[in-house]
């Protein structure tokens, strides 16, 4: 049966009326049951079940307990038992999660496109397919590609990373033979991760709020949307009662800034200069932890005039200036490294890495930072002095019989410092400030998630050319893109030869990813989707699905099995599952069973099973070859290997938790990996960046890569943050655009495309949740004669878009703020879902050249009445 756009909307309209008329779970669920059976469901005896599981709507993975009455999910509450290990509550998005499952607009059958033209106004002319026909069609296409060149397949996922587990996607693409699996981290926190990796060879940080007395928060808005929000919000409140002071530095008065002791409205993109000025205040006053810098970091290592660290005869071991012997030596037993100064060795002059930092911030005074960042010099000085004072440099504390470094002041960020053209350098500046007071892995400081877990991050990048991957990760174009690059595949497929890709991609599979609307300059992304055969696995007819050739319906997190990801805290960790509790539309498959079936039809089932064991790092209980697995059986296998617990524990409790002892929390990270002689060192000075720059320069010149701007790249690849990193491309070039355009996340739709139709979030919570607005400072609005509720136009060098003005005090006068997640246009959404401004459409595209992270907060704009 052929389904036109009108027929598609009519098909969901019968059930859509239920959603439009009220918010009863009963009404929607019974309508869904009626749709499944073809008639109204008969009354049954009342059966009430309590089901413990995990939320998968955002990357907090909160523990939940659902009440299921006669197969209908009636309520979702936080699992009280999980409070000791992570979340004490859940957000409205999680509490209303059943409305995503009972959404009448959901995809229910496989669909095939019959209109070859693709575009927002093109009717795909969908035709329903059986699962057999869908599998046969997709498998035939995949087999042809696998036989010819497996690299021609691209797999992309977004929130799908958490719905079935990225490990399954890794295993399947590895078995298939394509290097092109790409996830969404460059739309989230990649720059922060890479800054961590360059500095301490791992990623994942949290402030030790249980003991902290001062939190300097540069744009981590965990009262609205953040990865660890459901622990950070609760722990912050507990610690405030015990004396914690919070200072939030960001251009917009966010939820977390509104509840802080102080809000510092820094000019967008200029916080790196503010941080460097604070570092200068600490250095000039001598309020730094010199023993920490010497013993744990590479601050004493000798650096030549070209920025390269002096090495021993082996070409690998860094040298320091030994104050005992008066010569350049490796930091071994008996050597006492100099922290500061310039020294002569082998007829050349070298400075310590710390001295390079000192010289680099010499002119970045608080007064200079005031001019750039528009934060008073007195405020910058006071914050630096307070940070040093509260860090209590040199103090120790005894906990559980262990004498530990005590540094109860911490600087933290999420997207605030990282979602920019120089995002890696932004957070590197924050890490340096933390290192100066010695709070890394200290009580009350910044707790690292596995210091030196990946020593390869300290190496010079591979700088691949020609690139192996379509996203260009770890190639000469993005040498330290360790977390894939979400946005580049759809650019690359438009002109593979331009970047030297030695093959032409033909097919893309998208799983739970609405990539094109999620990143800057969205319409360029959609152009890429016209170049490939696209298969989309999702729960809704997203904009990406609108450009698909085959659409396969997926199950929601309340309908499917998963060995679920979880969030740890500085004190706890836990393992969990997610289990099904309803299936109102009687759907046959989730993404795992789709992958399993395709692997069978491609003759690679056993390879898939073998790769699953590798991807999940299973050691004792393995996925066996020569047999099939249901989603539940796979989860049982992983649970048994990871927890050594009977599966009945998973079914009854949903998780098993563990609490970290004092030694594992404070003494197994930097103390074990970096402290003292004969150890690797944290990189205050990221020398691998300058070494990588010289390698890129060589490759670019040998291959005549004119698209690589070496001057721009040298700024990006500085071993230390500099003032240049406060001036991204739009700030330097868009002189005729007076306003800074910044973006932010809101809880209601953050990182979860399938909540776009949630009737509770769209209608029941009020107008503030129903759409987004263009936030304008009251003074600016007066000057422009703009009032709240009026339609305004935002104009950038990319294009124009309209939105509804909201006049506020809580944003800088030179700044316009618009949230993501709104303004979507797919005909597969309810009318209530298609409201607001899709700000990504007009954001400039200037990704971080180190990590590939998208620059969501660098665009300049004009603003006027529509």
Model regions and ranges:
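Short beta-alpha connecting loops at secondary-structure transitions
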Residues: 260-266, 559, 573-584
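N-terminal leader/propeptide and maturation segments of large enzyme subunits in energy/redox metabolism
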Residues: 113-133, 287-381, 578-704, 741, ...
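Extended redox/cofactor-interaction regions of prokaryotic respiratory oxidoreductases
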Residues: 167-247, 273, 334-341, 353, ...
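Long, contiguous, secondary-structure-rich segments that constitute the structural scaffold
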Residues: 580-581, 590-643, 648, 752, ...
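Glycine-rich phosphate/diphosphate-binding loops that line cofactor/substrate pockets in enzymes
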Residues: 135-153, 205-214, 360, 383-410, ...
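N-terminal export/assembly segments and adjacent metallocofactor-ligating motifs
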Residues: 1-291, 295-338, 376, 509, ...
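Flexible glycine/proline-rich, aromatic-decorated loop/lid segments
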Residues: 255, 543-577
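Active-site phosphate/pyrophosphate-binding segments
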Residues: 353-355, 366-484
């Amino acid at each position: 049966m052929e389904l036109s756009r009108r027929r598609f909307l009519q098909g969901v309209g019968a059930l859509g009326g239920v959603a439009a008329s009220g918010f009863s779970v009963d009404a929607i669920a019974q309508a869904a049951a009626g749709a499944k059976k073809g008639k109204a469901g008969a009354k049954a005896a009342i059966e009430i079940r309590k089901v413990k599981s995990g939320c998968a709507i955002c990357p907090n993975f909160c523990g939940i307990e659902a009440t299921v009455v006669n197969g209908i999910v009636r309520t979702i509450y936080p699992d009280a038992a999980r409070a000791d290990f992570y979340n004490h509550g859940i957000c409205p998005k999680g509490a209303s999660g059943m409305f995503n499952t009972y959404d009448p607009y959901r995809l229910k059958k496989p669909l095939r496109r019959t209109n070859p033209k693709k575009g927002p106004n093109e009717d795909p002319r969908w035709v329903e397919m059986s699962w057999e026909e869908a599998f046969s069609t997709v498998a035939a296409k995949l087999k042809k590609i696998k036989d010819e060149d497996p690299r021609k397949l691209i797999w992309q996922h977004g929130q799908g990373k958490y719905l079935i587990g990225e490990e399954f996607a890794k295993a399947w693409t590895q078995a298939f033979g394509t290097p092109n699996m790409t996830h969404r981290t460059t739309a989230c926190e990649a720059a922060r991760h890479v800054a961590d990796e360059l500095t301490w060879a791992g990623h994942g940080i949290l402030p030790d709020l249980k003991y902290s007395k001062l939190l300097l928060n540069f744009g981590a808005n965990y009262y609205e949307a953040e990865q660890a929000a459901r622990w950070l919000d609760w722990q912050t409140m507990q610690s405030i009662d015990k004396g914690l002071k919070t200072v939030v530095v960001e251009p917009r008065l966010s939820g977390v800034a509104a509840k802080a002791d102080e809000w510092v409205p820094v000019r967008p993109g200029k916080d790196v200069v503010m941080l460097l000025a604070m570092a200068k205040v600490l250095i000039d006053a001598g309020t730094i932890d010199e023993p920490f810098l010497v013993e744990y970091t590479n601050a004493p290592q000798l650096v030549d005039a070209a920025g390269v660290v002096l090495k021993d005869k082996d070409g690998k071991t860094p040298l320091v200036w030994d104050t005992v012997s008066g010569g350049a030596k490796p930091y071994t037993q008996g050597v006492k490294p100099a922290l500061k100064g310039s020294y002569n060795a082998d007829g050349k002059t070298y400075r310590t890495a710390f001295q390079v930092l000192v010289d680099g911030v010499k002119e970045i005074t608080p007064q200079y930072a005031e001019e750039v960042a528009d934060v008073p010099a007195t405020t910058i000085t006071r914050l630096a002095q307070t940070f040093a004072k509260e860090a209590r440099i040199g103090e120790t504390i005894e906990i559980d019989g262990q004498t530990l470094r005590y540094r109860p002041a911490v600087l933290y960020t999420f997207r605030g410092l990282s979602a920019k053209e120089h995002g890696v350098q932004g957070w590197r500046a924050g890490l340096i400030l933390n290192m100066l007071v010695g709070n890394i892995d200290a009580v009350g400081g910044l707790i690292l998630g596995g210091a030196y877990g990946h020593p390869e991050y300290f190496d010079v990048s591979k700088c691949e050319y020609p690139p192996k991957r379509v996203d260009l990760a770890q190639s000469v174009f993005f040498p330290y893109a360790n977390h894939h690059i979400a946005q580049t595949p759809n650019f690359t497929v438009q002109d593979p030869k331009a970047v030297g890709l030695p093959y032409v991609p033909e097919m893309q599979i998208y799983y739970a990813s609405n990539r094109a609307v999620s990143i800057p300059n969205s319409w360029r992304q959609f152009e890429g989707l016209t170049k490939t055969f696209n298969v989309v696995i999702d729960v809704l007819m997203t904009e990406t699905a609108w450009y698909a050739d085959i659409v396969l319906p997926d199950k929601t997190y309340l309908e499917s099995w998963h060995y679920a990801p979880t969030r740890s805290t500085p004190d706890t960790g836990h393992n969990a599952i997610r289990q099904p509790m309803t299936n109102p539309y009687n759907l046959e498959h989730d993404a795992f069973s789709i992958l399993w079936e395709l692997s069978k039809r491609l003759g690679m089932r056993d390879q898939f099973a073998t790769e699953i064991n590798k991807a999940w790092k299973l050691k004792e209980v393995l996925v066996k070859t020569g047999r099939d697995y249901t989603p539940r059986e796979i989860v049982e296998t992983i649970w048994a290997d990871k927890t050594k617990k009977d599966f009945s524990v998973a079914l009854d409790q949903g998780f098993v938790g563990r609490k970290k002892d004092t030694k594992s929390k404070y003494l197994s990270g930097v103390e074990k990996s970096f402290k003292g002689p004969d150890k690797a060192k944290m990189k205050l000075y990221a020398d691998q960046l300058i070494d990588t720059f010289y390698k890129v320069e060589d490759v670019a010149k040998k291959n005549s890569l004119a698209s690589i701007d070496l001057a721009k790249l040298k700024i990006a690849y500085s071993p230390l943050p500099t003032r240049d990193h406060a001036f991204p491309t739009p700030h330097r070039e868009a002189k005729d655009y007076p306003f800074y355009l910044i973006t932010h996340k809101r809880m209601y739709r953050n990182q979860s495309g399938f909540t776009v139709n949630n009737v509770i979030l769209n209608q029941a919570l009020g107008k503030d949740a129903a759409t987004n607005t263009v936030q304008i400072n009251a003074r600016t609005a007066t000057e422009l004669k703009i009032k709240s509720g009026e339609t305004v136009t935002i104009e950038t060098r990319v294009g124009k878009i309209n939105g509804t003005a909201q006049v506020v005090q809580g944003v800088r006068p030179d700044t316009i703020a618009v949230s993501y997640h709104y303004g979507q246009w797919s005909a597969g959404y309810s009318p209530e879902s298609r409201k607001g401004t899709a700000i990504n459409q007009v954001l400039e595209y200037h990704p971080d050249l180190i990590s590939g992270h998208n620059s969501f907060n660098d665009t300049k704009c004009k603003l006027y009445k529509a």
